[in-house]
Amino acid sequence: MCGIVGAIAQRDVAEILLEGLRRLEYRGYDSAGLAVVDAEGHMTRLRRLGKVQMLAQAAEEHPLHGGTGIAHTRWATHGEPSEANAHPHVSEHIVVVHNGIIENHEPLREALKARGYTFVSETDTEVIAHLVNWELKQGGTLREAVLRAIPQLRGAYGTVIMDTRHPDTLLAARSGSPLVIGLGMGENFIASDQLALLPVTRRFIFLEEGDIAEITRRSVNIFDNTGAEVKRQDIESNLQYDAGDKGIYRHYMQKEIYEQPNAIKNTLTGRISHGQVDLSELGPNADELLSKVEHIQILACGTSYNSGMVSRYWFESLAGIPCDVEIASEFRYRKSAVRRNSLMITLSQSGETADTLAGLRLSKELGYLGSLAICNVPGSSLVRESDLALMTNAGTEIGVASTKAFTTQLTVLLMLVAKLSRLKGLDASIEHDIVHGLQALPSRIEQMLSQDKRIELLAEDFSDKHHALFLGRGDQYPIALEGALKLKEISYIHAEAYAAGELKHGPLALIDADMPVIVVAPNNELLEKLKSNIEEVRARGGQLYVFADQDAGFVSSDNMHIIEMPHVEEVIAPIFYTVPLQLLAYHVALIKGTDVDQPRNLAKSVTVE
C-alpha cells in the first residue's frame, strides 16, 4: 500500500526517485508524485493520476534538477484518486509524503483552519504538512518542529518531510508504517521498502516504532519520540530484486504460478538433512522453547490466513498440538484467553501487514510462550519483532494476488509440524512421510502445470458468470477458501467457499444452472462424503467443476466436468490442489479483461488497518 522514496545527494535525484517508485508499483496505487529541490531551494513538484510511467513522461517534459527529493505512490484512503490528492503535499516551504492513516485528521484540520491554513486536498496527509509548518513558525529547527507535531497525530504513519529553505536535510518519522534508510557514499536515501533502494545501496537501517530520523548527505541521526538520540544497527542486505522481468509470461502472477516448483525447492534448501527437517537456523535455544509448546495461536490476514487454516489440520492431526487460527484484525480488538504454553505464529508475505504486526505486539503483553514469524522478507518488522523467524525464500512476489508466497508458507508450516512432532517424541513415520511428500512436491506441481491448457479452456465457461461456489472438506476446505479468494480478487466474480458438509445449511439454496460449483477432491478418507455432497449439487442442476484425484472414480457428465489430477501424497495434497485453482482464477481474469497483477482497489502489502 502506498510507497515512499526519498533521496539526498550531490547528483540529480529525480531518476532515483522514479526508479524507486517503479519498484514499488507492485504494492498497488492510484496516483504518483514527486518533488525535487535544488541547492538554492527551488522546488519542482509533479503529480499524476494513474501509473508511474505517466509521471516519468511528465518528468521528461519538465526536467527536474536537484539533489534532494521525495516521491510517493498513493493508494486512496481519505479523498478520491485525483491529482489534487496525490502526494507530495505542500504547506509553503514544507513538503510531505506519508503512508498510513491519521485518525484525528478532522479535528486537526479544523484547528489549522482556525489558524488561517487553507486546505486544497481531501487527504489526511495535508494536515501533517500544515501542522509541521505551524510548529516551525513557533520556533526551532525542522527536527524540533517535527518532534512537537508528531505527538499530536493519532494513527499510523510513515512520513518524510523536507523544508525547501534547507534542502540539505530530510526528516522522517515512523509509527506503525515501515521506513528504511539506505546508506550511500556521500548520499543517503529513505523508502517504505528496501526494494526501492537496491539500485543505489545494499546498506540499510530499519527505523523502529517511534523513531525520528534526520538525514543529510553525510549523516543519519536517529531520535526517539522524546528527542533523545538512539543508535540503530545498519545491515548489509542480500535481497534480490529478481522479479522485475516477466520474461515469457504475460503477467507477474502467471510467472509466479510457474515459479512455484523452484520456489518450493528454495524453501526446502538446507532444511532437510538425513531424512529429517533441519531448522537449526532458529538458533540454539529454539528447541527448548518449541518443546514446551502445548498450544499454537496463528494470526494472519487474507491469503496468509488461509494457509494458517490449512496448518491447523496439520498441527492437530500430525503433531497433536491444539491450534487456533484468527484473523489478525479481529484478534487485536477482543479480549482473549491465552492458553498455557501457547506459541504465537504470525504469517505475512511482506512482514509489514499492519493488523498482524499489531496482533504480534499485543501478544507480547498477554503472556504467550514466544512468537515465531513466517515471512518472505528478511529484515521486515514482523521478523525483527518476533522471537523466532522462518523465511519462505519464495523470491520477490510482484502480483497482488499471492501465489508462491502461499505455497511456500504452507511448505514452511509443514516442516514446522515435522519438527514439533519429533520434539514431542511422536512416531518417526510422521516426519518421514512429511519429508518424503515435501521432496516430491516440486515435481508434482510441475506435473500439474502441464494441464494449464485444459484449465484455460475450462475458464471459458466462466466468461458470463457473476457468482461461483467453492467446496472442500477437511484440510481442503481452506484451499476452497483460497480458490474463492483468488477468483474474486482478480476476475471480480463474487465467489464464496464452504465446507462441503455445510451445503444443506444454506448454500444449497443458491444452486442453479448459472452457479458454477468448483470442488477439490483428493482421494482421501473424506472422498465418499464429498461425493454425496456433489450429488446434492447435481440433483439441483448445478454446474460442477471437480478437480479430482485420477483414482477417485469420477466420470464426467453433462453438468459435471472432471479435471483429473495426478495422485499425490495426502500430506501435500492441500499445497498441490492450490495450483489448479490459481490457474483457473488467472485464466478467468484474462477472459474478463481485468488487470491481473494490480486488481482494482487492492494493494500488495496492507500497511494500514
Swiss-Prot record:
Fetch the Pfam families from UniProt: GATase_6, SIS
Catalytic reaction equation(s): D-fructose 6-phosphate + L-glutamine = D-glucosamine 6-phosphate + L-glutamate
Q: Where in the cell is it found?
A: Cytoplasm
Taxonomically, the superkingdom here is Bacteria
E.C. numbers: 2.6.1.16
Residue ranges occupied by any SIS domain in the UniProt entry: 286-426, 458-599
Catalytic site residues?
A: 2 (nucleophile), 604 (for fru-6p isomerization activity)
Q: PROSITE patterns of this UniProt entry?
A: GATASE_TYPE_2, SIS
Which GO CC annotations does the UniProt entry carry?
cytosol
The record places domain Glutamine amidotransferase type-2 at 2-218
Q: What does this protein do?
A: Catalyzes the first step in hexosamine metabolism, converting fructose-6P into glucosamine-6P using glutamine as a nitrogen source.
Listed PANTHER family: GLUCOSAMINE--FRUCTOSE-6-PHOSPHATE AMINOTRANSFERASE, ISOMERIZING (PTHR10937), GLUTAMINE--FRUCTOSE-6-PHOSPHATE TRANSAMINASE (ISOMERIZING) (PTHR10937:SF0)
* Name this polypeptide is given: Glutamine--fructose-6-phosphate aminotransferase [isomerizing]
Species of origin: Salmonella paratyphi A (strain ATCC 9150 / SARB42)
* Biological classification of the source: Bacteria, Pseudomonadati, Pseudomonadota, Gammaproteobacteria, Enterobacterales
